Amino acid sequence: MSPDKATALTNSPLLNFVKELSGRRIEQARRRNGITQVQFAREIGISRRWLQEIESGNPSSRLDFHVVCAEHLQLKTGYIFFPFLFRGHQMEFPRELTYGDFDEIERECIDLIVRRNLSRMKQKLTPRWWSQQRTEGA
């Protein structure tokens, strides 16, 4: 990727929005758990200053650190990934969705993925003779 393209990606309004939203959620969860910035930064192996950058939603913060922080605080990460799912399909992400709880949406997505893949796996793993036995027994 060219440096110009990388710079354009880091200046993306969507990416900046996600980092800002993520930073707020990380800070809220950390405070709710009664963990100081110093403690949390030490736990995940970064400096307190870098954690401040993440929590403030600084555009220069790395998204992978947002994911590490969210996972460490046991936050679900749909709010990070769903906006990019929309973008990947050339759709604008409705920011109103970020005000709600993603739990149900995340579970429905997981359920859909599991159902589709279980069905396909079942077809692949079902021996041909099982269908022949059913036909012969009928």
Identify what each model region corresponds to.
Residues 120-138:
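Short, charged, intrinsically disordered terminal tails
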Residues 58-63, 89-91:
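Short, solvent-exposed alpha-helical "recognition" segments
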Residues 7-8, 81-121, 129:
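Short, charged recognition helix plus adjacent turn
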Residues 45, 64-80:
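DNA major-groove recognition helix of helix-turn-helix/homeodomain DNA-binding modules
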Residues 44-61:
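Recognition helix of helix-turn-helix/homeodomain-like DNA-binding domains
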